[in-house]
Structures are given as C-alpha cells and as structure tokens.
C-alpha cells in the first residue's frame, strides 16, 4: 500500500515574512492520518486553524494567502511546495505571525528541515487526485491547464523581456518520475525587480525582501553576487510555486500541468475549476504499491531517501 506520510518529530524555524517584514516563529508538528496540511495562528487570543485548501485562498498578489474569518496566513507556497515534493500528507504548521518565514526565498530550507526531522509513513492509504479530463483557465494571453497523465509532470514558460531573464532558459519541464524535486527544483529562489520595490512597499509588500532571500534584478542584470543557482532558475521558481499552489487541492496530483505566463492567481483558478468540475477527476489510492504508476513509486522512494 502507498501510505500517507507525516513528520517523525517536531521542527522549529524562525525568520522574517517576505511581504510583512515581521519576525515569525514557525513550528511544524506531526499530524494524524487524513488531517491534511493545517496552518494554526498561535499568536491570537484564541488559536485559529486554517486548512490548506484552494477555496481558502483570498489574496494572490505576489503570493498565495489563506484566509478564514479575517485571519490570514500568507506566503505559504514555498513550504507547501516542499511538503508536496517530499510527499508529506499531514502536518500542523503553527505560526505566531500572519506569514510563513521566507528563509532564503526557495523551498530548500524547508526541505532540509523536513528531512532532518525525518519522514514517517502512516497506516492509511495515500490519496491522489487523478485528473480524467482536460481543464484549462485563461486570462488574456496567460493560461494554465491540467491534462490526464499517469504521473505528475509540470511544464512552464515565461516572458519577461528582461536581458538577464532572456539569457536564461524561459521554458522548463519537470516530471516527478524522472527528475529530483530536491535537486532540480527546491533551490530555485523567488525573484523581483528593483524598479518595482518602491511600489510594492507602498502597498505593504516585499517589506522583508532583499538579496539574502530573493534574486534581485535591476534594469539589466542580476544583482546577487553569487549569481543564479540554476541556468533556468527564474522559470524553475515558477514551477516550484505551482507545485505549492496546486497542493492546495489537498492531495498529490496524477496529472500533467502546463502554464504560460501563469502565477498564483491562475494556479488557484485552475485548482478551483478542477474541484468544481467533479466529473473531471477522481480520488485514487493504491492498496498494492506495484499497481501504482511506476513514476509515482520512484518519486516517493526518492523523496523519502
């Protein structure tokens, strides 16, 4: 049986929120089977639990933000991406501020923390969302699409008309069966442009951003002294974000995802469109591991290594 997964032990980390710039302490705790990923704001008079679900997403400006009764948890996508990439089904995420810490701007620190704590299999079948019909959403020349696929594959293309980005690959594809999330996706950092910083900060965004937690570009070049971690780091980060955004479906996907010029808003629209069209997907479990797609078993074995 392909089993659900949680953490072996508690994980603690602290940092600043990318957009709010406020220090935040985060604790990840093991959770029982079928709990899912649940964020808990512990800084309030009464703790508020917000499940990581697509229909709980409110603001999608520059990040994915969950909201319940006016209580928010923002910039969840990098942590969600790490949890998805490592096949973690159930975890409590305690926060004492309204944002997940940005750490280095990628998913790699979260991957390191989770792997350090250890991954524990649980005595319950892992549930997948298997896409059975093509679903597409569009916004002008931007689009995102799900298609049936016996595994999990993501393809993304970007257009920024910037010299540094134009020099990098602007298309990338990741198949969980063939490529390592940890090695080839998790280290890709978020990126931003100096000319946008003033506008963002006037609107209460990017207050905690800097060279230590993002790729920063001026009009011509990357300002980070160490340069890029991947030749295609910009588009790889878009894939990293998409993996996190789409994990708000509540289960890992069996599907091919593709997008052109997409982002958090379009990813959330696609997830909601899929959930609303119930004839386009089904829940799949595998009581016998050998009956699962070979790529899925390879991915899960690799993620637990």
UniProtKB/Swiss-Prot annotation:
InterPro entries membership: Ribosomal_Su5_D2-typ_SF, UDP-acyl_GlcNac_deAcase, UDP-acyl_GlcNac_deAcase_C, UDP-acyl_N-AcGlcN_deAcase_N
Binding locations of Zn(2+): 78, 237, 241
Reactions catalysed: a UDP-3-O-[(3R)-3-hydroxyacyl]-N-acetyl-alpha-D-glucosamine + H2O = a UDP-3-O-[(3R)-3-hydroxyacyl]-alpha-D-glucosamine + acetate
One Pfam family from the record: LpxC
GO CC term, one of those recorded: membrane
Lineage top rank: taxon: Bacteria
GO molecular function terms attached to this record: metal ion binding; UDP-3-O-acyl-N-acetylglucosamine deacetylase activity
Enzyme Commission number(s): 3.5.1.108
Top EC group: hydrolase
Classification via SUPFAM superfamilies: Ribosomal protein S5 domain 2-like (SSF54211)
Active-site residues, record numbering mapped to chain: 264
Metabolic or biological pathway: Glycolipid biosynthesis; lipid IV(A) biosynthesis; lipid IV(A) from (3R)-3-hydroxytetradecanoyl-[acyl-carrier-protein] and UDP-N-acetyl-alpha-D-glucosamine: step 2/6
Keywords: Hydrolase, Lipid A biosynthesis, Lipid biosynthesis, Lipid metabolism, Metal-binding, Zinc
Entry's Gene Ontology BP terms: lipid A biosynthetic process
Reported cofactor(s): Zn(2+)
HAMAP family named among the record's database cross-references: LpxC
NCBIfam families for this protein: lpxC
Entry function: Catalyzes the hydrolysis of UDP-3-O-myristoyl-N-acetylglucosamine to form UDP-3-O-myristoylglucosamine and acetate, the committed step in lipid A biosynthesis.
Similarity-based family: Belongs to the LpxC family.
Protein name per the record: UDP-3-O-acyl-N-acetylglucosamine deacetylase
Organism (species): Dechloromonas aromatica (strain RCB)
Gene this protein is translated from: lpxC
């Amino acid at each position: 049986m392909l089993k659900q997964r949680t953490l072996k032990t508690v994980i603690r980390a602290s940092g600043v929120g990318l957009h709010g710039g406020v220090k935040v302490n985060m604790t990840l705790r093991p959770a029982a089977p079928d709990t899912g990923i649940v964020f808990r704001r512990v800084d309030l008079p009464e703790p508020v639990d917000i499940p990581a679900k697509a229909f709980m997403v409110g603001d999608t400006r520059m990040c994915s933000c969950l909201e319940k009764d006016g209580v928010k948890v923002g910039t969840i996508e990098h942590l969600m991406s790490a949890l998805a990439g490592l096949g973690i089904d159930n975890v409590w995420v305690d926060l004492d501020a309204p944002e997940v810490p940005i750490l280095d701007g990628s998913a790699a620190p979260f991957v390191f923390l989770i792997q350090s704590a250890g991954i524990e299999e649980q005595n319950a079948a892992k549930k997948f969302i298997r896409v059975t019909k093509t679903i597409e959403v569009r916004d002008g020349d931007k689009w995102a699409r799900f298609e049936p696929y016996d595994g999990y594959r993501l393809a993304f293309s970007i257009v920024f008309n910037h010299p540094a980005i134009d020099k990098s690959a602007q298309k990338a594809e990741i198949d969980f069966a063939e490529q390592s999330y940890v090695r080839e996706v998790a280290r890709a950092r978020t990126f931003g442009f100096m000319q946008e910083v003033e506008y963002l900060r006037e609107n209460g965004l990017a207050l905690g951003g800097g060279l230590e937690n993002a790729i920063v570009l001026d009009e011509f070049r990357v300002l980070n002294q160490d340069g890029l971690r991947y030749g295609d780091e910009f588009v790889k980060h878009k894939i990293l974000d998409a993996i996190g955004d789409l994990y708000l479906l509540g289960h890992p996907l069996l599907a091919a995802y593709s997008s052109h010029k997409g982002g958090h808003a379009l990813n959330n629209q696609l997830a909601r469109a899929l959930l609303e069209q119930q004839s386009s997907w089904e829940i799949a479990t595998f009581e016998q591991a050998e009956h699962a797609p070979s790529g899925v078993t390879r991915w899960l074995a690799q993620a637990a290594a």
